[in-house]
Amino acid sequence: MTSNQVIIDLQLACKNLHGLPNRKMFQSWVSAIFSIYKKKIELTVRIVDIKEMHYLNWYYLKKDCPTNVLSFPFTPPLGMKSPLLGDVVLCRQIIEYESKEKNVPGRSHWAHMIIHGSLHLLGYNHIVDKEAILMQRVERNILQKCGYRTCCHVAHR
C-alpha cells in the first residue's frame, strides 16, 4: 500500500506549534500501521492542549483528568461504506512531559502515541492483560518498522 492511500486530516489545535512533528512524520507513522490494508483509509489526527484534552476525557469517558491520547472510532450508518476510521486526539503537553519523564526521544514518543491511538481505531485494547500484551507487541513491531527503539515503549493501562 502506498502512503497516498492513507489520508490524514491533521488538525493543530494547540497554541504552541514549535517542535511538533510535521505532517510527513505523522503520515509515515500512520502509513506504517496501515501498510497491510489494500484500501483507502482516512483518519483525523488532532493535536490539542491540556485543557481541551481534559474536557474530552471528562465528557466522553467521565474521567476528570487529561490524558495523552484518545481515540474515537467512526461507525458509518448501516448500508454506507466509508474509508474514515475515526479520530485520534493527542495532547501535546502530556506527550512532551511523558517523553522527558521516561527519557524517551520526543519523536519516538509521538510515534508511539499516534500508533497507540490508531490501533484503538482498529479495535485493539489494553483493558485485560492478554489484550494489552498483544497491543504492546503490535506497537513494538510498528515502532521498529519506523526505525525506533522500543525498550521503553509500553501501552498505557
UniProtKB/Swiss-Prot annotation:
Its EC number is 3.1.-.-. Keywords: Cytoplasm, Endonuclease, Hydrolase, Metal-binding, Nuclease, Ribosome biogenesis, rRNA processing, Zinc. Binds 1 zinc ion. Its main location: cytoplasm. It is an enzyme of class 3 (hydrolase). GO terms for biological process: rRNA processing. It is found in: Cytoplasm. Single strand-specific metallo-endoribonuclease involved in late-stage 70S ribosome quality control and in maturation of the 3' terminus of the 16S rRNA. PANTHER family: ENDORIBONUCLEASE YBEY, CHLOROPLASTIC. Belongs to the endoribonuclease YbeY family. This is Endoribonuclease YbeY. The gene is ybeY.
